[in-house]
A protein has these predicted regions:
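Short, surface-exposed ligand- or partner-binding patches at beta-edge/loop junctions that are enriched
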Residues: 114-115
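Structural scaffold elements adjacent to functional motifs in cytosolic proteins
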Residues: 60-62
Length: 170
């Protein structure tokens, strides 16, 4: 028995890989960001971010320093591209390039969720990514440790750890 072959590529093989449709929670964040005139794709809470990461619908990138990740804790399986380094938080001039390179290594294009301590540095990082032409880069509001409470302490009010989401510490 013989099989017919063709030298023309199939439509699926010829077409570039399209990113999957944004999950509804990210579509909502994007619409809200556009309505507010934010210079990046928008923000999601840790409780919104975790299911997306868990289901393989988004890539979680921790933008804190290596020291913060080591001594304060980190989300298992999260990628790392430092927005800044050292105790002076010296800005990483290669941040957007490093984030783009990390994203390009993924087997399929995914939205990126940036996580820092409180959601402030990750918002700046998302803005920088947008300026560099990266789309669908979102901030995780509240961050890993959360906002300050009335006593100026973190971790008692909101944030990744406060909600009991997965994390590990060296």
């Amino acid at each position: 028995m013989t099989h017919a072959t063709t030298d023309t590529p199939t439509a699926a093989a010829a077409a570039p890989q399209q990113p999957p449709a944004l999950p509804a929670v990210l579509q909502q964040a994007l619409a809200q960001a556009q309505a507010q005139g934010l210079p990046y794709a928008g923000s999601v809470t840790p409780l919104q971010a975790w299911p997306l990461v868990q289901q393989g619908q988004a890539l979680l990138v921790d933008v804190r320093t290596a020291e913060e990740r080591k001594f304060v804790g980190q989300v298992p399986g999260s990628a790392h591209v430092a927005w800044a380094s050292g105790t002076a938080l010296t800005r990483n001039p290669r941040f957007a390039r490093e984030l783009a390179a990390l994203h390009a290594k993924q087997p399929q294009p995914l939205p990126v969720l940036l996580l820092c301590r409180s959601g402030k540095r990750s918002a700046l990082a998302a803005q920088e990514a947008a300026k560099a032409g990266l789309t669908h880069v979102f901030n995780v509001s509240e961050g890993f440790e959360g906002d300050h409470d009335a006593l100026q302490q973190r971790g008692h009010f909101n944030g990744w750890r406060f909600y009991g989401l997965p994390w590990v510490q060296d």
